[in-house]
From Swiss-Prot:
Gene source species: Azobacteroides pseudotrichonymphae genomovar. CFP2
Annotated Mg(2+) binding sites: 241, 288, 315
Entry protein name: Enolase
Pfam families: Enolase_C, Enolase_N
Compartment(s): Cytoplasm; Secreted; Cell surface
Length: 428
């Protein structure tokens, strides 16, 4: 089935910043549509999104250059291409760009087209996107990692760590896990309200109160879990996204960047010991970016110290790139990869990263970005790849709910064939 038209346009994301939406038209009349997210904290090795830089328009964040690249360069190259040749189409776009970071055409331009192509193919076949991408062996619904307290670059709270998440590991289904998360979210809102703290939400829908520090955030979450009628560890665990690259400089993890004078300054060894101490004290079973993307020795030390009992997720470390993931696997750094489609910039490369991780017995976590749209593609990717885990924000904001609601639909469609969580894959 041939592609007859590709149209790129500028739309707005959940932060009111411009982003890209793409329509791919087929000769049959079917259309695939996709839009592209963007991040607030980014790894230095991520594929580059193309912004206009015109300060007179959207404060320089416009994406008309990337849209033009879609309409004038990518579109002509894809006309009459077979829509089912996803890898070939992505290869054509990568060749047109010709850079390792996709800086010529823009990773946002390439990704928008790549995802829209897959959607168009699924629409033509009249099958769900997760089924088109993953085939017949797709049955794992992901454990949601719900960001309910924001810190770091995602809020103005004086906490260095970027995300405090709950993980409903004790649920029997995605639907139940989502309900558990919602109930804890509302219980936490009451905990914060009763303390006279703000219940305003950040970019990803989590609360951003002026807490005293990391342990205050953890204690507040545990109280909310208890108040909601659940048991820490057995029903719900806690995940952290330290986003350590954001406050790592000259070999030091400088918490004062976000926490002011009360913040500590830690060496790599001290950072490992601090995280190990938190794990021993609280029901934490997942830590993302506990060490900086530039601290590979620190990552090896952390993995050696607690990698046998905690999921250690590489985000900035791996940037969804098989080259960095391969290095991590060889050096024994982390045991899981965070998967962000716009970090690498094409569906093919995203799937390659997940496959490499799973073959090395690394877990994978499919993830949103802080700047999102109503597009729910990552929900389908999580199921398509049997990832078993998804990060798509808190339990508020419609841009986050779009992904959760899509997962509810998928679970309903799979019926009794559905399994819940990444551990289900390893047990089957």
């Amino acid at each position: 089935m041939k592609i007859v038209k590709v149209i790129g346009r500028e739309i707005l994301d959940s932060r009111g910043n411009p982003t890209i939406e793409v329509d791919v038209h087929l000769e049959s009349g079917f259309i695939g549509r996709a839009s592209v997210p963007s991040g607030a904290s980014t790894g230095k090795n991520e594929a580059l999104e193309l912004r206009d830089g015109d300060k007179q328009r959207f404060l320089g964040k416009g994406v008309l250059k990337a849209v033009s690249n879609i309409n004038k360069i990518i579109a002509p190259a894809l006309l009459s291409r077979n829509v089912f040749d996803q890898r070939g189409i992505d290869k054509v776009m990568l060749s047109l760009d010709g850079t390792s970071t996709k800086s010529k055409l823009g990773a946002n331009a390439i990704l928008g087209v790549s995802l829209a192509v897959a959607r168009a193919a699924a629409e033509y076949l009249q099958i769900p996107l997760y089924r088109y991408i993953g085939g017949v062996n797709t049955y794992i619904l992901p454990i949601p990692m719900m960001n309910i307290i924001n810190g770091g670059s995602h809020s103005d709270a004086p906490i260095a760590f970027q995300e405090f998440m709950i993980r409903p590991i004790g649920a029997s289904s995605f639907r139940e896990g989502l309900r558990m998360g919602v109930e804890v979210f509302h219980a936490l809102k009451k905990v914060l309200h009763d303390r006279g703290l703000s219940t305003a939400v950040g970019d990803e829908g989590g609360f951003a109160p002026t807490l005293k520090g990391t342990e205050d955030a953890l204690e507040s979450i545990i109280q909310a879990i208890d108040n909601a009628g659940y048991k820490p560890v057995e029903d719900i665990t806690i995940g952290l996204d330290c986003a350590s690259s954001e406050f790592y400089k000259n070999g030091i993890y400088d918490y004062t960047k976000f926490e002011g004078t009360i913040g500590a300054r830690r060496t790599s060894i001290q950072q490992v010991e601090y995280l190990s101490e938190l794990v021993s004290k609280y029901p934490i079973d997942s830590i993302e970016d506990g060490m900086s993307e530039n601290d590979w020795d620190g990552w090896k030390l952390l993995t050696s110290k607690i990698g046998n009992k905690v999921q250690l997720v590489g985000d900035d470390l791996f940037v969804t790139n098989v080259e960095f993931l391969k290095k991590g696997i060889e050096q024994g750094c982390a045991n899981s990869i965070l998967v962000k489609v716009n970090q690498i910039g094409s569906l093919t490369e995203t799937l390659d990263s997940i496959e490499m991780a799973h073959r090395a017995n690394y877990n994978s976590v499919v993830s949103h970005r802080s700047g999102e749209t109503e597009d729910s593609t990552i929900a389908d990717i999580a199921v398509a790849t049997n990832s078993g885990q998804i990060k798509t924000g808190s339990l508020s904001r419609s841009d986050r709910m779009a992904k959760y609601n899509q997962l509810l639909r998928i679970e309903e469609e799979l019926g009794d064939k559905a399994f819940y969580g990444y551990k289900a894959l390893k047990m089957c």
